[in-house]
Amino acid sequence: MRVDEFLKERNINVGDFVRITKEEDGEEVTYEGYIMPPYELSAGDTLVLKLENGYNIGIALEKIRRIEVLERAKVKPEVHFEALIEGKPGLPEVTIIGTGGTIASRIDYETGAVYPAFTAEELAKAVPEIFEVANVKPKLLFNIFSEDMKPKHWVKIAHEVAKALNSGDYGVVVAHGTDTMGYTAAALSFMLRNLGKPVVLVGAQRSSDRPSSDAAMNLICSVRMATSEVAEVMVVMHGETGDTYCLAHRGTKVRKMHTSRRDAFRSINDVPIAKIWPNGEIEFLRKDYRKRSDEEVEVDDKIEEKVALVKVYPGISSEIIDFLVDKGYKGIVIEGTGLGHTPNDIIPSIERAVEEGVAVCMTSQCIYGRVNLNVYSTGRKLLKAGVIPCEDMLPETAYVKLMWVLGHTQNLEEVRKMMLTNYAGEITPYTRFDTYLR
């Protein structure tokens, strides 16, 4: 039996508050919560119940012994948000570009429903506070998981951002899944030339139907940062585990450093640009950010997609490098050990790659610190083989940058010059010890 049939037979509706008794390990266990609508990936014979603590559980229909309705779903009168949506004179205009995820959705605990938010009215229902900061214009560009994001999506986002900024918007927010947000932030940092206004990427670590969700505060802070004087690509996410402030990170220096913590995003080898409080207070943590200007944004979207990111590990085979060369890859970014090393027995394959015109760049899997190939003999051999040391660039940033560089030239000397040119703050001029694990 399917969930819809099960509920219909018992005159139970989505949003009803129920008590379910089920069999579990030979004993009866009772749960109370709201009946949730089935979603795309849920099993047809599993009932989803939202507990009062905000978490969802799935209960197989065959395990249910009793179900009773404690309270019927409340039917709310239709609420309109025209006043918010129409905007207020004098407020700046900010476009929010949606690419996927649940950053702007909110649970209605009286009905059990989750509101996805990407029309203006849905955004007003979910996070009305942002309409007090700016006249918000939402646009859903596409709706994909961030792990499915490809370079072609970066290009589309870049063009949509430039279109909004060049049409008069004060700033742009890009709502994005967190898993690959750092890659997209780096790509936009290189593609958006002459940037004169803020571009803010924002996501949520906790889904919006959980009481610990960070979605609303992140979105509020991101809109506030989009109206600031900072003309850079930034990532705005929780600055610590509580709901006190968010941090604005430079798009080329930010990395997701935890699978689930709300403050998972950190600036690496650098300090964040600013702290943002939901009430509008902004504390700038550095002065060397690009300032707002009237320049027209240009999109430089020439990229070479045949670039690989390879992590060194004990026992790595030179066949991996050979395979990439034989398959026509134009660039390889290596996450080396320590200061930027590889086993000696794969250096001949790296040398062959360079001889055949493949750009090989070195980063460190330590994440913190700087590549230095002059300290040990292995590093000096890699330099002699033609490897380009990427200073303190994040591996993900170096990967995106090499794509962008190879889109402009495949002359290895020119590639070297461009990889070592600091275009968007991706290279810190000196090693900062005060940024380690902060």
Swiss-Prot record:
Give residue ranges for domain Asparaginase/glutaminase: 92-422
Q: Does the record bear Iron-sulfur in its keywords?
A: no
- The entry's active site is 102, 178-179, 256
**Keywords in alphabetical order:** ATP-binding, Ligase, Nucleotide-binding, Protein biosynthesis
Q: Which PROSITE patterns match?
A: ASN_GLN_ASE_1, ASN_GLN_ASE_2, ASN_GLN_ASE_3
Q: Which reaction does it catalyse?
A: L-glutamyl-tRNA(Gln) + L-glutamine + ATP + H2O = L-glutaminyl-tRNA(Gln) + L-glutamate + ADP + phosphate + H(+)
Q: Which GO terms describe its biological process?
A: amino acid metabolic process; regulation of translational fidelity; translation
GO molecular function of the protein, one example? Answer: glutaminyl-tRNA synthase (glutamine-hydrolyzing) activity
Q: Which parts of the chain are coiled coil? A: none
Q: Which SUPFAM superfamilies match?
A: GatD N-terminal domain-like, Glutaminase/Asparaginase
InterPro entries according to UniProt: AsnA_fam (IPR006033), Asp/glu_Ase-like_sf (IPR036152), Asparaginase/glutaminase-like (IPR006034), Asparaginase/glutaminase_AS1 (IPR020827), Asparaginase/glutaminase_AS2 (IPR027475), Asparaginase_C (IPR040919), GatD (IPR011878), GatD_N (IPR040918)
EC id: 6.3.5.-
Enzyme's top EC category: ligase
Q: What does this protein do?
A: Allows the formation of correctly charged Gln-tRNA(Gln) through the transamidation of misacylated Glu-tRNA(Gln) in organisms which lack glutaminyl-tRNA synthetase. The reaction takes place in the presence of glutamine and ATP through an activated gamma-phospho-Glu-tRNA(Gln). The GatDE system is specific for glutamate and does not act on aspartate.
UniProt cross-references to PANTHER family, sorted A to Z: 60 KDA LYSOPHOSPHOLIPASE (PTHR11707:SF28), L-ASPARAGINASE (PTHR11707)
Assembly notes: Heterodimer of GatD and GatE.
* Record family assignment: Belongs to the asparaginase 1 family. GatD subfamily.
Protein name per Swiss-Prot or TrEMBL: Glutamyl-tRNA(Gln) amidotransferase subunit D
The species this protein belongs to is Pyrococcus abyssi (strain GE5 / Orsay)
Tell me what gene encodes this: gatD
